[in-house]
Curated annotation (Swiss-Prot):
Contains a bacterial GIY-YIG-like domain. It comes from the Eukaryota. GO terms for cellular component: cytoplasm. This is Protein EFFECTOR OF TRANSCRIPTION 3. Its main location: cytoplasm. Pfam families: GIY_YIG_domain. The keyword Cytoplasm applies. Residues 103-152 form the GIY-YIG domain. It is found in: Cytoplasm. The keyword Cytoplasm applies. GO terms for biological process: regulation of DNA-templated transcription.
């Protein structure tokens, strides 16, 4: 369905809602925010001016974009840097064998997770890795190598904290996905991102060691382009509340 047709349908929906509100105005109390929302839309103001709801990325195992990404792969084990600095035999600072096979432009997510000694091949990244950072670059392989060697541009304290807890660093990537980064950053608050989400929240990643939190992580797929808002109108004479409509509010990508 084209964007033009969707816009026309949305306008008809709002006109119908506004007509309903006007016809019951004498006996109705309307939420000021919703009334202004409707008026703004009808006179051409965009919803994007409103402050969007942000979801903590680590709370969600799945997103609408998962199909575009590779599987989660281990980049740095929690003891790799320590063992390398101690000159332990056959140890490297990062898992170079798990990097993308070619150099290309793309999008990547970093995650943290626990690989227990008893898990071995049964380790399930989807259930045990928390997404903490998203970025894009012209050469994903080189960027990941930089993270593996020296932590990249991220503060060293982030790595020290998670390694001390026994957590490892993971990544997944998708080629040619610059637009997707904007959608993810406009939807999710990543614990290690600051460009759109404010201060880093690395201390909150201690929840990775909380079995109750890990078992309750949300698995539903979030669609960044659509938000649901319920308009409630209270009719005072009848002393009851009814729902007039559920508005599908479209958020622009990026």
């Amino acid at each position: 369905m084209s964007f033009v047709l969707l816009s026309k349908m949305a306008k008809l929906k709002f006109n119908h809602i506004r007509h309903t509100i006007i016809s019951t105005q004498k006996s109705t109390t309307i939420m000021p925010g919703i009334s202004q929302l409707l008026n703004n839309r009808l006179i051409g103001k965009e919803f994007s001016s409103a402050v969007p709801t942000m979801f903590k990325r680590e709370d969600y195992k799945l997103t609408i974009h998962d199909i575009a990404f590779s599987k989660w792969r281990n980049l740095i084990r929690h003891n790799d840097w320590k063992d390398f600095n101690n000159r332990k035999e056959r140890v490297r600072r990062y898992r170079h064998e798990d990097l993308p096979p070619q150099r290309c432009t793309g999008l990547y997510e970093l995650g943290v997770g626990v690989i227990g000694q008893d898990q071995g091949q049964n380790f399930d990244p989807d259930n045990n890795v928390l997404g903490v950072y998203v970025g894009q670059c012209v050469d994903v392989k080189s960027r990941l190598q930089d993270y593996g060697r020296r932590g990249g541009h991220l503060p060293s304290g982030l790595y020290e904290d998670i390694f001390s807890e026994g957590y490892s660093v993971f990544y997944r990537w998708a080629p040619e996905a610059a637009a997707t980064e904007g959608m993810l950053l406009s939807t999710f608050d990543y614990a290690w991102n600051t460009c759109s989400n404010g201060e880093r929240r690395h201390l909150e990643l201690q929840k990775l060691g909380d079995p109750e939190f890990m078992s309750k992580r949300k698995s539903q797929v979030l669609v960044p382009s659509i938000r649901d808002q319920v308009v409630t109108i209270k009719v005072e004479k009848s002393n009851y509340t009814f729902l007039t409509s559920t508005l599908k509010v479209m958020r622009p990508f990026g």
